[in-house]
């Protein structure tokens, strides 16, 4: 088994080098059936080995889960990943420009693949001839972050993408980084931190800005459904801070939530603005229950968390006819979409992939290759990328922007 996998990996590296040097990606988007999105399907160790044995390397990378994988699979994942981003060894051997990607994969889970894959897709899109290395550090413990950044700096990686949560950023900000090291963090917003470090850039979309935009479409009778997660709690707080003080909050933190006791003959829900700070599944459940109990809300409002085509398959058209969503993704590059599809992720709906691409686009064109052209036009405001917010509505079997924006 081990010998066959090594042979497969060697043949893959040779194939990839040919691809990087000779082939041009088609600007035509692939069909959904050819590059299916398998994000919600579990792939155990046997499944991962099967993907390797059949040569489905991109699928292996996109579905790898470090929590369940054995040591051999972890080693193969790391080697295969660094084989993919080692685009041209002859050029990279003498390259003075380097990019490091630091990932606490046990902490950010599936976001690990999203950040790495979208980075690879962007560099392929730009035909980048730079040295890239991925550092998998497990968790965001201060000692591990210190070790990773020391190693990256010792190896002369001056440009770093770090997939950190709030905890990781707080530990990072304690570090004494070289003055020429620049760090981009796509996963969090600068608003959450008291820092003036000019070499640390933040890339999260602005949920607070989205809430403020959504409330422009409210009639003031605000009712919040929340699922009790850290993100939902932050969204709830944003609504309360921007609202009129009359908001009510209902938290759905279990599958046994009693909708009947809340919705049945509850006149306060009629003609109300219902704000859904809930996951896709719970949003679909709430919207169907609202219709079941003959409630006619003024509007349903939700942020980026529910801007996903999966919502269309989870809900009936009548369930979402009054639903408005905030969206900060604005990708028009079809080749970049295609390359992300190779990794079974959709940059047009995955904000982590989009934010990673936006930040890397800025780093690459401003610092790594100043002769290249930017793909995105998001600007910087005090080292935080600034995203526009568009309001989207469901129309039939798809999404469409409101016309009066």
Task: Identify what each model region corresponds to.
Residues 2-8, 17-405:
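Extracytosolic ligand-binding ectodomains
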Residues 11-12:
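Repetitive helical segments and hydrophobic/amphipathic motifs
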């Amino acid at each position: 088994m081990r010998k066959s996998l090594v042979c497969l990996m060697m043949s893959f590296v040779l194939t990839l080098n040919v691809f990087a040097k000779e082939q041009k990606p088609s600007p035509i988007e692939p069909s959904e059936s050819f590059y299916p999105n398998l994000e919600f399907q579990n792939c155990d160790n046997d499944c991962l080995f099967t993907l390797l044995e059949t040569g489905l390397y991109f699928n292996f990378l996109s579905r790898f889960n470090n929590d369940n994988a054995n040591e051999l699979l972890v080693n193969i994942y790391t080697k295969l990943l660094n084989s993919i981003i080692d685009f041209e060894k002859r050029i990279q051997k003498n390259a003075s420009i380097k990019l490091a990607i630091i990932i606490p994969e046990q902490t950010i889970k599936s976001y690990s693949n999203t950040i790495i894959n979208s980075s690879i897709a962007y560099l392929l899109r730009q035909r980048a001839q730079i040295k890239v290395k991925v550092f998998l550090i497990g968790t965001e413990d201060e000692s591990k972050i210190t070790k990773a950044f020391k190693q990256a700096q010792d190896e002369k990686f001056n440009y770093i993408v770090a997939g950190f949560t709030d905890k990781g950023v707080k530990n990072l900000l304690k570090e004494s980084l070289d003055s020429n090291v620049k760090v981009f963090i796509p996963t969090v917003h600068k608003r959450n931190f008291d820092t003036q470090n000019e070499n640390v850039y933040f890339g999260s979309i602005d949920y607070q800005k989205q809430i403020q935009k959504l409330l422009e479409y409210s009639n003031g009778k605000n009712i919040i459904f929340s699922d009790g997660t850290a993100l939902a709690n932050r969204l709830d707080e944003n609504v309360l801070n921007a609202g009129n003080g009359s908001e009510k909050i209902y938290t759905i933190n279990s599958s046994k939530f009693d909708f009947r006791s809340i919705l049945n003959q509850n006149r306060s829900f009629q003609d109300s603005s219902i704000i859904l700070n809930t996951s896709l599944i719970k949003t679909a459940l709430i919207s169907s229950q609202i219709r079941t109990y003959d409630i006619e809300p003024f509007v349903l409002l939700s942020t980026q968390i529910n801007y996903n085509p999966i919502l269309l398959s989870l809900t009936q058209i009548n369930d979402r006819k009054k639903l408005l969503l905030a969206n900060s993704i604005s990708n028009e590059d079809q080749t970049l979409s295609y390359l992300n599809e190779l990794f079974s992720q959709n940059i047009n709906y995955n904000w982590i992939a989009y934010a990673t691409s936006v930040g890397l686009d800025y780093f690459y064109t401003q610092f790594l290759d100043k002769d290249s052209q930017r793909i995105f036009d998001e600007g910087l405001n005090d080292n935080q990328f600034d995203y526009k917010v568009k309001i989207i509505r469901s129309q039939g079997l798809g999404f469409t922007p409101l016309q009066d924006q």
